Amino acid sequence: MGEPQQVSALPIPPMQYIKEYTDENIRKGLAPKPPLPINDSYMMFGNQFQCDDLIIRPLETQGIERLHPVQFDHKKELRKLLMSILVNFLDMLDILIRSPGSIRREEKLEDIKLLFVHMHHLINEYRPHQARETLRVMMEVQKRQRLETAERFQKHLERVVEMIQNCLASLPDDLPLPNGADSVKTEPMDVQEPCTDHYKGSQEAAASMKEATIDKDAAMCVIIDEMT
């Protein structure tokens, strides 16, 4: 009779898991499917939980006596619980000194345990608020970082534009053009020309200005090449 197969409580090693999802297995449809969502109950840390359970369950559903009222101030109740724990701890020390074997020691220990359970429960009721506040702070940090990044980009852009304008302003007017290009000549337009000639002349003037700008850019590139 063979020995029963032992099942590990831990997941399989990562490399063995990765080997199941190779390109060939995915192409052939042999890769394992993802596990189905849990619909009823599950085990976690040795305890069974229902999927529809509340994140923070009331004390009554856990079989624990409620010491505070239904409507209360969390801060006041937490302070009261803290003082009660301190007083009960001092009582416990007094019992341990006077009569360590007394039954009151177990009773006082249960009282302290109940107080700690209530304190943890009230603290856990702040968890949703803590999660929302953490998300808000995280989003504010991301917003501030993005605004600072955009501001730095804007400053760099202004600096680059200023440098380019200074470079263009420092170019002499009689700078020789590369490849023997002719200088651009512009003449005033005759006011007696018809509208069609005026439109044609505007197009020619715009083309001339564009060529002049290109020539200046080319000349600046030549200067930079000579400097380097």
UniProtKB/Swiss-Prot annotation:
The keyword Transcription applies. It comes from the Eukaryota. It is found in: Nucleus. Keywords: Activator, Nucleus, Transcription, Transcription regulation. Its main location: nucleus. GO terms for molecular function: transcription coregulator activity. InterPro entries: Immune_Mod/Transcr_Coactivator, Med7/Med21-like, Mediatior_Med7, Mediatior_Med7_sf. One of its GO terms (cellular component) is mediator complex. GO terms for biological process: regulation of transcription by RNA polymerase II. Belongs to the Mediator complex subunit 7 family. Component of the Mediator complex. Component of the Mediator complex, a coactivator involved in the regulated transcription of nearly all RNA polymerase II-dependent genes. Mediator functions as a bridge to convey information from gene-specific regulatory proteins to the basal RNA polymerase II transcription machinery. Mediator is recruited to promoters by direct interactions with regulatory proteins and serves as a scaffold for the assembly of a functional preinitiation complex with RNA polymerase II and the general transcription factors. This is Mediator of RNA polymerase II transcription subunit 7-B. It comes from Xenopus laevis.
